[in-house]
Swiss-Prot record:
The protein, known as: Large ribosomal subunit protein uL18
Task of the protein: This is one of the proteins that bind and probably mediate the attachment of the 5S RNA into the large ribosomal subunit, where it forms part of the central protuberance.
Species of origin: Thermococcus kodakarensis (strain ATCC BAA-918 / JCM 12380 / KOD1)
Assembly, per entry: Part of the 50S ribosomal subunit. Contacts the 5S and 23S rRNAs.
UniProt cross-references to InterPro entries, sorted A to Z: Rbsml_uL18_euk
Domain of life: Archaea
Gene Ontology BP terms: ribosomal large subunit assembly; translation
């Protein structure tokens, strides 16, 4: 381990790989709410957060478990379609709470073009939340609606049905054929829009 009078011990959260303080400072200087997006192996989480000296305050939040519980989503919580739907949900929640704009905070996630993190961003923007961005970072539409998953499932079923049933058991046990994921995506998307757009009327 390095030592000496010029050696500085990094902040604990930086050592633990939880916070990039240089990036955080740049975000805080904007003085705007942050659209915080985080990804785990099986889920996505989104929050609208504002800075407070005593600790960040979460104004609204959404989790892919909500998609399953409240809107009947039967797909995986960690894929691109669920990320977009989560973005749509957090965007509508933010608008409902009177939040019109935010800046994206992806933490230590690498800013990979077309990643599911940016699918959350697209969903939030489509819901009407103003977030500075470049559309070039969005995933392609066929990935957002799950067409790539459906095509893979169709091909796998024809080639090896046993492997198909094993790999997509999570879908099948919920009564969803993965080949029909794009249609299911549109159904759940419509439910989210109806809940919030209908409430305005």
């Amino acid at each position: 381990m390095a030592h000496g009078p010029r050696y500085r011990v990094p902040f604990r959260r930086r050592r633990e790989g939880k916070t990039n303080y240089h990036k955080r400072l740049k975000l805080l200087k904007s003085k705007k709410p942050r659209l915080v997006v985080r990804k785990t192996l099986n889920h996505h989480i989104a929050q609208i957060v504002v800075y407070d000296p005593k600790g960040d305050k979460t104004l609204v939040s959404a989790h892919t478990m909500e998609l399953m519980r409240d809107f009947g989503w039967k797909g995986h919580g960690g894929n691109t379609p669920s990320a977009y739907l989560l973005g749509l949900l957090i965007g509508y929640k933010a608008k409902q709470a009177g939040i019109e704009e935010a800046i994206l905070d992806i933490g230590l996630h690498p800013p990979t073009r077309g990643s599911s993190i940016f699918a959350v961003l697209k969903g939030a923007v489509d819901a009407g939340l103003n977030v500075p961005h470049s559309e070039e970072i969005y995933p392609e539409d066929y990935r957002i609606n799950g067409e790539h998953i459906a095509n893979y499932a169709k091909a796998l079923k024809e080639e090896d049905e046993a492997l198909y049933r094993k790999q997509f058991s999570g879908y099948l046990v919920k009564g969803l054929e993965p080949e029909k994921l794009p249609e299911h995506f549109e159904e759940v998307k419509a439910k989210i829009i109806e809940k919030f757009e209908g409430a305005r009327e």
